Curated annotation (Swiss-Prot):
Its main location: nucleus. This is Protein IFH1. Residues 1-251, 283-302, 457-493, 507-622, 676-700, 747-774 are annotated as: Disordered. Residues 120-165, 607-620, 676-686 have a biased composition (Acidic residues). The keyword Transcription applies. Residues 209-239, 283-297, 584-599, 747-764 have a biased composition (Basic and acidic residues). Keywords: Nucleus, Phosphoprotein, Transcription, Transcription regulation. The keyword Signal does not apply. Residues 54-66 have a biased composition (Low complexity). It comes from Saccharomyces cerevisiae (strain ATCC 204508 / S288c) (Baker's yeast).
Length: 1085
């Protein structure tokens, strides 16, 4: 609200007076400046207004003379008029009592604050009137003293009266005096200070209302009057001489807020007060009131419109602290008029306008539909349509949930709307709770969201409870069908032990506490404990109405605590007390009976509750107590207790079957390893079960020899049988012997004898009786060359009955490969029974060469060989297809070249070449024939080479093999075949379609492989420079090199030494034309 002040309280009764400042402040300032010459000029307002201090202390001590307030009421009309004026405009400050900060004497300030008391409003009003009258009485006493002499006077007067001080009343009077600090508003700083000193002297004399000290006090007061008159006259002269300067000086004071007290800035900080210095006596005021009222009335009547303010010494009121309790009590109980505000305050004339504006704003807020304070529409207004809907829905809601009128009142307090927001027909377009099929409207200021998070959570909880209730009913129906009704046995557990029994079970508890089965009608306390158990699980019990507790405690439904305990344990899959105490033989039957009894009892309770309160969403009965299994026993989902220690409670047959299956699996997995040998010691429990291990440990372990050596069998770790020999585990799989030392020495001697003369009969006997096995020492110390002796190898060959060549029978395998025998390991090829299957050894003396590192038995080797054979055939077929395509390409190129050669018949008749004149396609010229022989020369007339050249090539029957084998395609060709191919004419070659045919005229059959070789050797060459002698010589050298390569039993490769492209490049480097060369590499690609 504009123009309003902060809501702080004051002690002024605003029913009759206004606490605002006057609006005509400038006029008061001018009047104050004009009237300073004719009278004592109090300080007036200047351009900057003083900050008004609003600390109020309106309580009066119960230890002071309250009866004096009636006597101090003045009938002077001037006093009443001035009092009303001061209250209405606050021109002289508030008639409140200030407690200032103590600076020099902290002990007295804390002592005075301990005895402060707060009274009711009537005492505060009486004290306000007293303070106003005291102010008038003090005005006459404020004319006597200066600031310089005030300290010594007060010290001398009060210190002499210490023996007459009543400290209880002194503290109360000090509080009254502290609150009266701002009442002296009519004089300047000197007059105010001197009047306060004089009043202090009067008060210090009257320390107690006893009549014994009255005579002494009267004598002191007469002296004070004389001093006050002298001070008044001197002060008037000083004020008349410097009126304006005094006003500016008085207005220059500053408030200092320190800790709990507020002090002024122009005080004498080095001043120390004595005890009882500022005790106020209202009786003395009445006695001396006549003379003081005259001077006071002269000042006040002439300067009624001026604003007066205090300039209080800081040291004068420095020992008083604010009573915080009284201060905040006054603030909370009074109105906020006349308090400290900003510099721009409103006067009396502005109040009606501000009140009218406030009413208009409030009415707009009440009538505005679009504004809401807590998210609801019409917070204070009423909508007839809404009221009707609320009534209808409220009645319907009460009928469904069974609420009474008290619950309705609670619901009205808790929420503004009793029906969900999405069911309101006014907001049917807003699908806040829709399933997403309808488009949702965005929220706006005209349609605020009416449901907060609390309401949403309530709705979700209600829906969840409904679903859980339905599921529970279905479970009960299924359980009734599966289980047979039988009697139940429950333990009689005390109510105090309920919480203990939920978490702890004792073995002896169930044996002595068996009780009868049945339903107890006096089960009120049991259900109460069930509610306690539900409070442990459910966190929303405080939101439930009070009706449910009456429903639960009605005694209509009852059960026992042990039953509820077992229900909890049943859901959590934990063993109950009943099962822990029973034996294993009778455990299953008793558990089944108890389960059926528990579930039947819970079924009866649940059906009754469901029939009576079917639609009750907030029902907290046993049927609505749902337990999170993971909260009670997190490990129950993974672990089920075995029958030996404690058995798990299973509520259905399917759970039992699952648990039995899991137990069987667990026994299978944790089956103990049993060795055949009964004398075995130090069994390692960490070993895998025997099913995962092979029969002979280490039978598949292989040692890889260097691949540089071909034909050596890979070594193998030795194996042992543990039937008759004791052994112990070293590192899981390796063993050590446990024979005696004497037996070991005997075995060592036998070992040395075997090294010199190996005994083969030992191996033959070991197969029969499995005795006399190798020990660890024997394996470590045996000779590596034992297998290399001729007799031993001969015996091994006779045992295997394999066909082996003469070199291997003589035992010269190492000599053949010329590789020294290096011992690799003490376990290599030792401890192997030679009479076992072939898969335990790789046949080193068989015809088949096994590559280094080849692992597997004969069966796997055969499979791998078949796979390799199929792969080789596939690659061979692909290679043949590529060659056939290249041959066709070559023939096409040759036919093209023949057509070009027909135009050059005259130039090509050199060196015995006869030109065939016919134009048919068979008159081709073989440009690759030998220059020394005619192309028509028969093969038997070809020059024969040295026999030693042909003897290097073995004449096998593999030369004319089918094209499916790779050997024939890569086999070297002898000189005779080359001369035969080179001496033949083109007409002698068979066509591709007649490979297996026979030419009767020539008497030769050309195979497919020979045709491939022929095509590669007789590759076409460009004939641009055929007549040149150098070209012919290079062609001859090329052909002669091919013949030499074939004579030396070297293979032709597509990127080898004798490729056409390499030789052509060499010829180009030597000076010949590069175009003359034929790219032989491209042909074989």
């Amino acid at each position: 609200m504009a123009g309003k002040k902060s809501p702080r309280k004051s002690t002024i009764n605003h029913s009759t007076h206004s606490g605002k400042l006057p609006a005509n402040i400038k006029r008061l300032i001018k009047k104050g400046e004009s009237d300073t010459k004719s009278r004592q000029s109090p300080p007036t307002l200047s351009t900057t207004r003083p900050r008004r201090f609003s600390l109020i202390y309106s309580s009066e001590s119960s230890l002071s003379d309250v009866s004096d307030s009636d006597k101090n009421k003045s009938t002077n009309p001037h006093k009443i008029k001035r009092k009303a004026k001061n209250i209405s405009n606050n021109s002289q400050g508030k008639k409140s009592k200030l407690i200032q900060r103590q600076i020099d004497n902290d002990d007295e300030g804390t002592e005075s604050s301990d005895y402060q008391a707060v009274t009711d409003g009537e005492e505060s009003e009486n004290e306000e009137e007293e303070s106003e009258e005291e102010e008038e009485d003090d005005d006459e006493d404020d004319d006597d003293d200066d600031d310089d002499g005030s300290d010594s006077d007060s010290d001398s007067e009060t210190s002499s009266d210490d023996e007459n001080i009543d400290f209880v009343k002194l503290t109360a009077q000090r509080k009254k005096r502290a609150m009266k600090a701002l009442s002296a508003m009519n004089t300047n700083s000197n007059t105010l200070y001197s009047s306060r000193e004089n009043s202090n002297k009067n008060k210090s004399v009257k320390l107690s209302p006893k009549k014994e000290n009255e005579e002494e006090q009267k004598e002191e007061k007469e002296k004070e009057k004389e001093e006050q008159q002298k001070q008044q006259e001197s002060n008037k002269k000083e004020v008349n001489g410097s009126g304006t300067t005094t006003t500016q000086q008085a207005l220059s004071f500053k408030f200092k807020k320190e800790d709990d007290g507020i002090s002024f800035g122009n005080g004498n900080e080095g001043y120390n007060e004595d005890i009882g210095e500022e005790v106020l006596d209202l009786k003395n005021k009445e006695n001396n009131g006549n003379e003081e009222d005259k001077l006071d009335s002269k000042v006040m009547l002439g300067n009624n419109d001026e604003l007066r303010f205090p300039n209080i010494s800081e040291s004068d009121e420095s020992e008083y602290d604010i009573d915080q309790d009284a201060y905040f009590d006054v603030i909370n109980n009074e109105d906020s008029h006349g308090e400290i505000g900003t510099d721009l305050e409103t006067g009396e004339d502005d109040l009606p306008i501000l009140e009218e504006e406030e009413q208009n704003i409030v009415s707009e807020l009440q009538n505005d539909d679009e504004l809401s304070f807590d998210g609801s529409i019409h917070e204070e207004g009423s909508d007839p349509v809404e009221d009707a809907e609320n009534k209808f829905l409220q009645n319907e809601y009460n009928q469904e949930n069974g609420y009474d009128e008290e619950d309705d009142e609670e619901d009205e307090i808790m929420s503004d709307f009793d029906m969900p927001f999405y069911e309101d027909p006014k907001f049917a377009n807003l699908y806040y709770y829709g399933d997403g099929s309808e488009p949702k409207l965005s929220l706006s200021t005209s349609l605020p969201l009416m449901l907060n998070d609390e309401k949403l959570s309530k709705l979700k909880k209600k829906e969840a409870k409904k679903r859980e209730q339905e599921e529970r009913k279905q479970r009960r129906k299924l359980y009734k069908k599966t289980q047979k009704p039988s009697t139940r046995t429950t333990s009689n557990v005390d109510n105090d032990e309920y919480i203990f029994n939920v978490f702890f079970q004792s073995d002896d508890e169930n044996s002595g506490h068996k009780s009868k089965k049945g339903r107890h009608k006096s089960g009120k306390s049991h259900i109460e404990h069930k509610n306690k158990g539900s409070n442990l699980i459910k966190s929303n019990d405080d939101l439930e109405p009070s009706t449910h507790s009456t429903v639960l405690n009605s005694g209509k439904y009852d059960s026992s605590d042990d039953e509820y305990d077992n229900i909890l344990l049943d859901v959590a899959h934990m063993p109950s007390d009943d099962e822990c105490s029973e034996s294993e033989t009778s455990h299953d039957a008793d558990t089944d009976e108890e389960l059926r009894a528990l579930d039947s009892d819970s079924l009866d309770i649940g059906t009754e509750l469901d029939d009576d309160y079917e639609d009750d969403d907030d029902d907290s009965s046993v049927t609505n107590v749902f337990i999170d299994i993971d909260d009670l026993d997190p490990d129950s989902f993974y672990f089920h207790y075995d029958s030996d220690g404690s058995s798990s409670l299973i509520s259905s047959n399917s759970d039992k079957e699952n648990s039995d299956g899991s137990k069987d699996c667990k026994h299978d997995l944790l089956e103990t390893v049993v060795y055949v040998d009964d004398e075995s010691t130090d069994e390692d429990d960490n070993l895998p079960p025997p099913s995962s291990r092979s029969k002979n440990i280490g039978s598949k372990a292989k040692e890889i020899v260097s691949s540089n050596v071909v034909g050596l069998r890979p070594p193998k770790l030795g194996t042992w049988e543990t039937d008759n020999k004791p052994f112990s585990i070293i590192d899981g799989l390796s063993t050590k012997s446990l024979y005696a030392l004497i037996q070991e020495h005997q075995q060592l001697r036998e070992q040395h004898q075997r090294a010199q003369t190996p005994d083969v009969k030992r191996e033959g006997s070991s197969n029969g009786n499995n005795g006399d096995e190798l020990t660890l020492n024997e394996l470590l110390n045996m000779s590596e060359l034992e297998d290399d002796s001729p007799s031993h190898t001969d015996d091994m060959e006779n045992n295997y009955n394999d066909a082996i060549n003469s070199k291997s029978t003589n035992g010269h395998a190492a000599d053949w490969y010329e590789v020294p025998k290096v011992p690799l390991s003490a376990f290599r090829n030792k401890g192997i029974n030679a009479y076992e299957e072939d898969e335990y050894m790789i046949p080193a003396n068989s015809n088949r060469k096994v590559p280094i590192g080849y692992i597997g038995n004969e069966r796997t080797r055969k499979k791998i060989d078949k796979m390799k054979e199929l792969q080789r055939k596939k690659t061979e077929k692909k290679r043949q297809l590529k060659k056939k395509k290249k041959l066709l390409k070559i023939r096409k190129q040759r036919q093209k070249a023949i057509k070009e050669q027909e135009t050059m018949n005259l130039q090509l008749g050199i060196n015995g070449h006869e030109i065939i004149g016919n134009n048919n396609s068979h008159s081709d010229i073989n440009t690759g024939t030998d220059f020394t022989t005619n192309e028509n020369t028969p093969m038997n007339e070809l020059p024969s080479h040295a026999p030693e050249d042909a003897s290097l090539i073995p004449h096998n029957s593999d030369l004319a093999v089918d094209s499916n084998t790779r050997k024939n395609s890569t086999k070297s060709v002898g000189l005779d075949e080359i001369h035969e191919i080179l001496g033949k004419d083109e007409n002698d070659l068979l066509s591709v379609g007649d490979i297996n045919g026979y030419d009767a005229q020539e008497g030769h059959v050309i195979e497919d492989t020979d045709a491939d070789i022929l095509a590669s050797l007789t590759a076409p060459v460009q004939f641009d420079n055929t007549l040149s002698h150098e070209n012919s010589n290079s062609m001859w050298r090329r052909r002669q090199s091919m013949v030499e390569a074939a004579a030396e039993n070297l293979r032709f490769t597509k990127n080898g030494l004798f490729s056409e492209s390499a030789l052509a490049d060499i010829e180009g480097i030597m000076g010949n034309d590069v175009n003359h060369s034929f790219e032989f590499n491209d042909v074989l690609q």
